[in-house]
Amino acid sequence: RLQPLLPPPPSHARGGAPRTVSDRACMAAILFMARTSTPWTLLPVGEFGCGSVTSCWRRFAEWAHAGVFERLQEALLDELGQAGQLDWSRVSVDSFSLRAVRGGPGGRKPGRPGQARIQAAPGVDGGGLPLSLLVTAANINDGLVFEALLGDIPAVRTPAGGRRCRPDKCHADKAYDHRRCRSYLTRRGIKVRIARCGIESSDRLGRHRWKAERSIAWLAGCRRLRIRYDRDSERFFAFAMLACDRLCYNRLPCATSARLP
């Protein structure tokens, strides 16, 4: 699944020796980095057979720049859609923030002065599988990225052979209780299920919105998403998409005997 999505090796004017480290070994090391949040300098390259830390890091930087992990998620969603594993009856959106200890594009979250933070917002289907993901500064209101979050849901194949990117309903908490968000859902023909400020209780997540919280906990299983150590936004987003790819792959029917750790 990954090999057809990889970009060709970069060419240099001076030439050079061909690559001897396999893409599979580098991918295993990158997945280890995402799961454990180990510093690059402490990567056990001998266990994965990926040559050196520099070789693995360069391969990851090339793949992140080429958008390999985003395209991998689309390919996995296509397989899940054809197998009937996606629940389009509803989609739930939520966000979570994390510290950016080395700075980078972002902002300070209100109420937490002195801490640079970023915010990640996943959109999940009725079963909790991530369909889209956005990474923004922590001081940006959730409602401002609502349209972009739903608009990033790719057109996924269905068991009937067509493609679909529009859910029947959208569930969200009070952070998305804006006229802009409700109007956007109405224009797209999506039923509005957004908690209203001053009406719905904050003590309960509801019968469906809890799945977004559960998906956030699943994503946090990749420790690289608990604290941001990467200064480069492109590489951090690649790690976030890799966490989504891991969830999608483990839901495939063929992955019952070969689940990713």
Show which residues each predicted segment covers.
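Short alpha-helical elements
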Residues: R1-P261
